[in-house]
Amino acid sequence: SSVERLYVEEKIADEFTKLVVEKTKNLRQGLGKEAETDIGSMSSERQTEIVEDHVKAFEDSGAEILTGGGRNEEAGDIFFEPTVIKNATNKMRPMQEETFGPTLPIATFKTEDEAIDLANDTEFGLTASVWTGDLSRGRRVAEEILAGTVNVNEVLYTHGIGQTPWGGFKNSGYGRTHGKEGLMELVGVQHIHVNRFLFTPDVWWFGYSKNAIETFKQMSRTFASGSIIRTIGLLPQMWKRIKELRNK
C-alpha cells in the first residue's frame, strides 16, 4: 500500500520537511527494471491524471509544493515527479481520497490525541505506521489507529512475512489474506448437530404451549442466575419441566 498522508509533530516539522525534500530531490527516476532506478512510472495515463488533479487541488487549497509537482517528460509520458507538499490539512480533498502516486502531503499535529484523530479522519483504513523513540507510546498510539495493519518504526514488514494477516477497515475492503485469518477466508464453515435422544422431541419443537413458555423462562433463570449454587439448585425444577414437555 502507498503512503497517502504524513503527520509530523509541529515542533520538528520544519527540520523534518527540509530533510525530506533533500532526500526526494536525490531520487533517481526511470524504468523499474533498471537497478539504478529509485522510482518508476505510474501504471497508466488515467492514474497519472489523478495525481495531477490531486496536486492541483492541493495548490488551489493553499498547500505549497516544495519539489516535483508535474510530469517528468524526460523519463516518459506517465512518469510523475516525486512530490513533497507542505501545509496540507485534512480539509483538502486529496487528503480524503486515494492518490496512489509519488506525492507526500505533510500535515502537522501538536498532541498525541490530535495525531490519532487526524489519522482516523478518513474513510479508509488499510495500513499505517507510527514513528517514535518511545516504543510503549508507539504501541499505545498504534492500538488507537483504525487500520488493518499498523507498524511501529517499520513500513514493509507485512509484505515479507506471510504469517501476518493483510486487510483493511472501513472502505479499505473486507476480509483478510495471508496468515491464519487469510486461510480461514477460504474455509466453508459447516455446523453438524446430532440429537442423541432418538425420536424424543426437544422442548423447542413445534407445538408450543403456556407450559413450554414457562419452561424456557425457567431455563433462562437457571443458566443466567450468576451463581453456581443457585444454578445447581434450580436444575431439578428445570429438568422436571423438560421431561413433562417431552412426554406430552
Question: What do the PLM-derived regions correspond to, one by one?
Answer:
Residues 7, 66-68, 130:
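Short beta-strand segments
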Residues 1-5, 21-53, 70-79, 96-101, ...:
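Flexible, acidic loop-helix segments that line cofactor/substrate-binding pockets
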Residues 2, 11-39, 53-68, 87-94, ...:
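Glycine/threonine-rich helix-loop capping motifs at alpha-helix boundaries
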Residues 11-13, 47, 111, 135:
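Helix N-cap motif at beta-to-alpha junctions
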Residues 28, 72, 79-248:
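Conserved C-terminal structural/oligomerization subdomain of aldehyde/semialdehyde dehydrogenase
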Residues 15-16, 50, 137-140:
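Phosphate- and divalent-cation-binding pockets in alpha/beta enzyme and binding domains
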Residues 5-12, 84, 172:
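Short beta-strand and adjoining strand-loop segment in the mid-core
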